[in-house]
Regions:
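Conserved, mostly hydrophobic/aromatic
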Residues: 28, 55, 63, 97, ...
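N-terminal carbohydrate-binding accessory modules
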Residues: 1-62
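Hydrophobic faces of well-ordered beta-strands that scaffold small-molecule active sites
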Residues: 34-36, 63-65, 104-108, 186-190, ...
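Carbohydrate-binding surfaces of carbohydrate-active enzymes
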Residues: 254-261, 274, 288-290, 294, ...
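The substrate-binding groove and active-site-proximal loops of carbohydrate-active enzymes
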Residues: 33-45, 69-88, 145-166, 218-220, ...
Length: 696
């Protein structure tokens, strides 16, 4: 059950605000989720109105702001919220936004980052041993961050949650009167980029005593009995004489079980314990967000939808969107990318997964942070990078975004509005983009993806536990376009192939084959299996030889409905925890072809070529190669918007078959027009740019 379904079964949203596919419905009116970030506490209060007017002039409908705990706290449990310091008067800031017709997305943390020292947490919290995450050796877990490193909090720590709840209680009396319909706040974000503060290696953390207790409860709930757990792990019973006396408690009671501290698997079934630990991290984060959400409600901040933002590289972190969706209403992504071919592929992969999940849940695919500028310790991101990223994300299914940052502030370079509310040239692009989205009714359009590449959660957990670079986050490798092949150990555990690598290679081979022919597809996470497979004509499932029975059943059901199912590069001989199957899967339920193995790139190319004809798949091929096209349709199925993406450093003329997209197109940003000749639409493309074209 998702958070939205849970609300539907109870009192739901009590303030006439709810999420819908096109955005956020407020008192019956659908408002597209187009927002801009403004940090009031970093600006002169006398400039707030000018800054917010400039945000509205860019065509944005909401203002997004953090409410930093450390900035407002003057003593434990006591906040300064404008009584003596006008710069911290959140009420006045929100009321100005309301006067201007802007709604507010409030982000009270407790973790906010925002390039603040300690990520916006009070210094007393991060240096409190009871609040600190713990390493396997029970040391604080340090984050090497500018201006200096600090110990990160534990998402399991009761002391930390008690302190966060006290902060919310102090904040509640000021924020509650600002909630819609009495004020402009219509959306709350819970925490921020909750990837364990970027110390997200499988064996980095969290060995805090409260986390160990929660881990044992997680195992007890999952297995029910210690005998079931012992059977799963292949652990002998005490009377079999094979267990050292020092460890016999571990096989007789949950309360004595300790988590793994390093990867020590020697055979496939040894992985079960490690995969459980990786899954526990996902459970820990979802549980923490749920606790924080309940603390907000207890402080009077209730009746509104909630969000959480996943950081770049989220697929390599313990953030499991399918689980986070059970405790918050909208899971979005943060985008900070360069304009280049690698980023284009990453954006396509991330956004297609987000869009497919969001569509299935009837919520908008939302970028909680769409980078406009960069912090000074980041690789520079210029205006071309920002324009490329947002247009590319829209091309692959994004339906709303928050311009981060809309207004300049300290520790940020390149926002479209300066700190006095004066628009810079970059603001013109965002204003034109907002107008283009409104003109086309883009929030109501849909990009169809009849092909789904399914990545079982087992594969992502396996890549985490087999990560080869210690505390250097797997997310870093994902951000730069590297996969399991570049970051995982090549152990085969006796199976004769590198266990964590080949499924990733398989998925990427199909991505490349599909894109070469312009076939629209989406990536789907394995735990979205119950919501994101229904309308697919072709399911491609990557597996290293392990598959959950529940996932196999979903694939078989899809096959029974008429979809084609392709699995590979290995036959699934294990369940999702690499335990031998008691009864082998009946692969005949998936079709007659069997697993696709052998020369995967060649086989993928042949399979795609065959499927285009046999499954009547759309193909928006574009000449020359390396140029990508996506099409967005209205409710009647008519193509309305065409994106042409040139991630290369070449100035080229892209040629698109006009049969699928019409004979005339106009660029919604620079007003260029194009007309098909001899059945081909020719579009001039500058290097590393994206065109958004209205079709006629």
């Amino acid at each position: 059950m998702t958070a939205r379904e849970d609300r539907a079964g109870g009192e739901g949203f009590g303030r006439r605000v709810r999420l819908v596919p096109g955005g956020i419905e407020i008192a019956g009116d659908v408002v597209p989720l187009l927002a801009g970030s403004v940090h009031y506490w970093r600006l002169d209060p006398n400039e707030w109105r000018a800054c917010l007017e400039a945000v509205k002039a860019m065509g944005l409908r909401l203002v997004d702001t953090y409410i930093p705990w450390a900035v407002h706290e003057v003593a434990p449990g006591k906040l300064e919220l404008g009584a003596s310091d006008p710069q911290r008067d959140i009420t006045r800031f929100c009321r100005i936004a309301e006067e201007l017709g802007l709604y507010v997305i409030a982000r009270p943390g407790p973790h906010i980052n925002a390039e603040l020292t300690y990520f916006g947490l009070p210094e007393r919290i991060v240096w409190d041993p009871a609040c600190q995450a713990r390493s396997p050796d029970q040391n604080p877990v340090m984050l090497p961050m500018l201006p200096f490193a600090f110990p990160v909090p534990s998402y399991a720590s009761d002391a930390f949650h008690d302190e966060a709840a006290r902060y919310f209680q102090a904040l509640g009396p000021v924020l509650t009167p600002l909630l819609y319909p009495n004020g402009p706040i219509v959306l709350f974000q819970i925490d921020n980029e909750g990837a364990l503060y970027f110390r997200d290696g499988a064996y980095d953390q969290d060995y805090h005593p409260d986390a160990i207790r929660l881990y044992r409860e997680f195992l007890r709930e999952k297995y029910g009995t210690i005998d079931a757990l012992r059977a799963s792990y292949g652990t002998p019973t005490p009377d079999e004489g094979e267990v050292p006396s020092s460890r016999r408690g571990e096989v007789t009671r949950f309360s004595a079980i300790d988590p793994p501290r390093k990867l020590d698997a020697e055979r496939p079934r040894d992985l079960a314990r490690h995969l459980d630990w990786s899954e526990f991290h996902e459970h820990l984060l979802a549980t923490a967000f749920q606790r924080l959400g309940r603390a907000l409600v207890a402080a009077g901040m209730d009746g509104l939808p909630t969000t959480h933002n996943l950081p770049p590289g989220q697929d390599a972190t313990p953030l499991n969107a399918a689980r986070v969706t059970k405790v918050v209403d909208l899971v979005g992504l943060d985008y900070y990318h360069m304009a280049d071919p690698t980023s284009r592929a990453i954006i396509a992969r991330r956004t297609s997964e987000l869009a497919t999940r969001s569509e299935a849940l009837s919520v908008p695919a939302f970028a909680c942070e769409m980078g406009a500028g960069f912090p000074p310790f980041f690789p520079p991101l210029d205006e071309r990078d920002g324009a490329f990223t947002v247009l590319c994300a829209l091309a692959y299914g994004l339906r709303g975004f928050n311009v981060y940052m809309a207004v300049e502030r300290d520790r940020w370079i390149g926002a479209p509005i300066d700190r006095h509310g004066r628009a810079r040239p970059y603001a013109v692009f965002w204003r034109k983009l907002s107008a283009a989205l409104e003109q086309t009714g883009f929030h109501e359009l849909r990009r169809k993806t009849p092909v789904r590449i399914l990545i079982p959660r087992t594969e992502r957990r396996l890549a985490r536990v087999m990560h080869a670079f210690g505390p250097l986050s797997g997310a870093f490798f994902s951000i730069v376009g590297a996969g399991a092949r570049e970051r995982c150990v090549e152990d085969d555990l006796g199976l004769g192939y590198p266990l964590a690598i080949e499924a990733d290679n398989f998925a990427r081979a199909f991505e490349q084959a599909l894109e070469a022919r312009g076939v629209p597809f989406a990536v789907v996470g394995g735990e979205d299996r119950d919501i994101a497979l229904g309308d697919a004509r072709w399911l491609i499932c990557a597996t290293s030889g392990a598959l959950k029975p529940e996932l196999f059943d979903r694939l078989a059901e899809a096959r029974a409905r008429g979809a084609r199912v392709t699995i590979g590069p290995h036959e699934p001989r294990f369940d999702g925890a690499f335990r031998p199957l008691s009864v082998p899967f009946d692969l005949g339920r998936l079709g007659e072809d069997g697993p696709l193995t052998g020369d995967v790139p060649a086989a993928a190319d042949a399979a795609v070529s065959n499927a285009i004809g046999s499954l009547d798949l759309p193909a928006y091929a574009c000449d020359p190669g390396g140029i990508y096209v996506t099409v967005h349709e209205d409710a009647a199925g008519a193509p309305r918007v065409l994106f042409v993406v040139n991630p290369s450093d070449r100035d080229i003329v892209a040629r698109v078959s006009a049969g699928a997209v019409g004979t005339k197109a106009s660029d919604l940003i620079d007003d260029s027009t194009f007309e098909a000749r001899a059945g081909t639409l020719e579009v001039r493309m500058k290097p590393r740019t994206v065109r958004m074209l209205a079709l006629r």
